[in-house]
């Protein structure tokens, strides 16, 4: 049986960009959100073999440490011409320095080496797996994706991570060129384009709506 989120919620991330997006999505529901970083919680090793497994690891670790419900996201970019890479290793490609400019350049170099210059050879998708875990072991999980193509050079300074090279399907601007309202579906535009917004809508239906 599904469980509703009430009271305080730990956002199990130390990523400032991801934290801002998750707080933005939670804001309309009046949830008091505190981050794992603010609580001084350690980051668990992400040893899962899927986005969902890693989201669960992060949420369960934070819930156990804080003795509060915890909300985690594991997300990444999967490039078709690179056999789904960087995938669950999207953050690791940027290294400890969070050098996403370097990671984007690495992807572009690999695409060029494979002759992937035409848009139809540059398809990719973002995946977001969300998990809410409670201290008693109950979990709720959802996953969603956003399809698109990769552009070069990067465009826009909004968002974070690989947003400046990701052109969502049916649009002429990258995620890096969109406002958070456009990307995440904040009022008044409704459901947004992003993988995280789509996954959050699924989660809200079972844990927050009503």
Swiss-Prot record:
Enzyme Commission numbers on file: 3.6.1.66
Q: Where is the active site?
A: 74 (proton acceptor)
One MF term in the entry's GO annotations: XTP diphosphatase activity
For the ligand (Mg(2+)), the binding residues are 45, 74
Known catalytic reactions: XTP + H2O = XMP + diphosphate + H(+); dITP + H2O = dIMP + diphosphate + H(+); ITP + H2O = IMP + diphosphate + H(+)
Is Acyltransferase among the key words of this record? no
- Fetch the InterPro entries from UniProt: dITP/XTP_pyrophosphatase, ITPase-like_fam, RdgB/HAM1
The cofactors required by this protein are: Mg(2+)
Name any one Pfam family assigned in the record: Ham1p_like
Could you tell me the keywords of this UniProt record?
Answer: Hydrolase, Magnesium, Metal-binding, Nucleotide metabolism, Nucleotide-binding
One GO term of the biological process aspect: nucleotide metabolic process
Gene Ontology cellular component annotations, sorted alphabetically: cytosol
Per UniProt, subunit arrangement is: Homodimer.
Q: What is this protein called?
A: dITP/XTP pyrophosphatase
Q: Which organism is it from?
A: Rhodopseudomonas palustris (strain ATCC BAA-98 / CGA009)
């Amino acid at each position: 049986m599904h469980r509703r989120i009430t009271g305080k919620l730990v956002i199990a991330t130390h990523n400032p960009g991801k934290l801002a997006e998750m707080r933005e999505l939670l804001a309309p529901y009046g949830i008091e959100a505190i981050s794992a970083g603010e609580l001084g919680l350690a980051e668990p090793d992400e040893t899962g073999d899927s986005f969902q497994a890693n989201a669960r690891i992060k949420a369960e670790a934070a819930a156990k440490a804080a003795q509060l419900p915890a909300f985690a996201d594991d997300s990444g970019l999967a490039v078709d011409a690179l056999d789904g890479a960087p995938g669950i290793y999207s953050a690791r490609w940027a290294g400890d320095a969070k050098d996403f400019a370097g990671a984007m350049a690495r992807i572009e170099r690999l695409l060029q080496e494979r002759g992937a210059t035409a848009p139809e050879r540059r398809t990719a998708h973002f995946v977001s797996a969300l998990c809410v875990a409670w201290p008693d072991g109950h979990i709720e999980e959802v996953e969603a994706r956003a399809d698109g193509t990769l552009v070069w050079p990067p465009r826009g300074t909004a968002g974070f991570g690989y947003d400046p090279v990701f052109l969502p399907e049916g649009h002429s601007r990258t995620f890096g060129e969109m406002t958070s309202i456009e990307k995440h579906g904040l009022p008044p535009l409704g459901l947004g384009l992003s993988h995280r917004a789509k996954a959050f809508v699924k989660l809200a239906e079972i844990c927050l709506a009503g």
